[in-house]
Design a protein with these regions (language model features):
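Secretory-pathway-linked proteins and extracytosolic
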Residues: 23-34, 151-155, 159-165, 172-221
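Homeobox/homeodomain signature
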Residues: 15-17, 125-128, 202
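A sequence-composition feature that detects small, non-aromatic residues
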Residues: 7, 101, 214-216
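Bacterial Sec-dependent N-terminal signal peptides
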Residues: 1-25
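Lumenal/extracellular ectodomains and adaptor appendage modules
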Residues: 22-151, 157-172, 207
């Protein structure tokens, strides 16, 4: 049986853009008290949020897409070298504009800026398609919060797979519309709906997903 992934498909219908600053600049670290739930998985997602913004340059007619991912994850066990790495795809990406990380444990909170993250690129595992950042000194029980943003060329259509290889308590998808219309379709989810919100002072659409299961590596037949 073919594995069904939870997928969003986005269609831009009418394009008319404001010239506000990019919203990724105003996404802050999570300030809520972290509520943990028992899990047998090596990793447990507290949240995994996606932001997509279509942005018109202030100085030219060019339009870009800024995609931000903001995650907070509990490390229960480190059984895989990938558990302490951040892998960012560069496929169809013109620029990685920001990468930040925060490591939280019982005693300390350590934050890494974009300049510090650049020094953590693992050149052996990075190539023209992916950047691999290796976070230092991670221990079991740590909570890792990550934010990164990539810049892409404009495209009328887009899609996003929401699930990960570990369970996620909460996931949000926010499409920052500004002054254009969009059409979002949700596939393989029966309890999630699109709602209109104002995000960073801009007209946006939001979808909330609760208690996402981990994806599995399955054979196709």
């Amino acid at each position: 049986m073919k594995k069904k992934f939870l997928v969003l498909k986005i269609l831009l219908i009418v394009s008319y853009f404001n010239t506000y600053s990019q919203s990724y600049l105003n996404i802050d670290w999570d300030s809520d008290k972290t509520i943990l739930f028992p899990s047998d998985n090596d990793l447990y997602g507290i949240f995994n949020n996606h932001y997509v913004e279509y942005f018109k340059s202030k100085f030219t007619e060019e339009v870009y897409v800024y995609e931000t991912r903001h995650t907070k994850t509990k490390i229960n066990r480190i059984n895989n070298p990938l558990d302490n790495e951040i892998i960012i795809s560069k496929i169809n990406v013109s620029e990685i504009v920001d990468v930040r990380a925060k490591i939280i444990n019982q005693d300390t909170i350590i934050s890494y800026s974009f300049d510090e993250m650049k020094k953590m690129i693992n050149s052996d595992d990075s190539d023209e398609n992916y950047n691999n950042y290796k976070l230092p000194n991670l221990d079991e029980g740590d909570i890792v919060e990550i934010m990164y943003t990539v810049k892409k060329d404009f495209n009328f259509n887009g899609n996003k797979i929401i699930e990960e290889s570990y369970p996620i308590l909460l996931s949000k998808f926010i499409l920052i519309e500004n002054n254009f219309k969009s059409n979002i379709k949700i596939y393989n989810s029966n309890n999630s709906f699109v709602s209109d919100i104002i995000f960073d002072g801009k007209k946006s659409k939001q979808i909330i997903f609760n208690n996402l299961n981990a994806t599995a590596n399955e054979q196709y037949s």
